[in-house]
């Protein structure tokens, strides 16, 4: 599980859905949550939180400027590639953050991913969890 530090910016509510904006690594990320009284208690602007997401929730691209229907992204440097027959574990660095992605080996081969290469990690808003 990846865990990054973030700060609550604000949130919007529609019915039982909350869209929370957090500041993370000099960008604004969007997190979708199911509304609850306990969730709203955590959403005070300026509050420090952790954003969590699974290694398998990351999509990777070689170009950060491609049009994609995913709002949250981090441009990273590849630190390490651990190959398996079907899946690879890729360790990425973004400033002081280390992020782990699990992706198909075929994708790693197609992208020719090697340590030192720049990649963009994309994470959907509904794949994120907030932790206080």
Where do the PLM segments sit?
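Glycine/charge-rich catalytic "coupling/switch" loops of P-loop NTPases
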Residues: 2-5, 10, 28, 36-80, ...
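Short, conserved beta-turn/loop elements at beta-strand boundaries and strand-helix junctions
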Residues: 11-17, 81-87
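Residue-level structural signal for beta-strand termini and adjacent loop
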Residues: 14, 34-35, 84, 105
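A generic beta-sheet turn/junction motif
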Residues: 15, 24-26, 53, 85, ...
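Short, acidic/hydrophobic/Gly-rich beta-strand patch recurrent on exposed beta strands
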Residues: 19-25, 32-33, 89-95, 102
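Hydrophobic transmembrane alpha-helix bundles
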Residues: 90-104, 123-130
């Amino acid at each position: 599980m990846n865990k990054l530090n973030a700060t609550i910016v604000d949130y919007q509510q529609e019915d039982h859905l909350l869209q929370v904006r957090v500041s993370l690594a000099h960008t604004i990320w969007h997190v979708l949550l199911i509304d609850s009284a306990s969730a709203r208690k955590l959403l005070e602007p300026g509050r420090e939180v952790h954003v969590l997401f699974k290694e398998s929730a990351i999509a990777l691209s070689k170009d950060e400027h491609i049009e994609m229907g995913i709002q949250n992204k981090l441009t990273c440097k590849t630190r390490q590639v651990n190959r398996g027959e079907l899946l690879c574990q890729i360790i990425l660095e973004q400033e002081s953050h280390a992020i782990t992605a699990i992706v198909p080996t075929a994708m790693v081969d197609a992208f020719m991913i090697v340590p030192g290469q720049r990649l963009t990690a994309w994470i959907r808003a509904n794949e994120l969890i907030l932790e206080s």
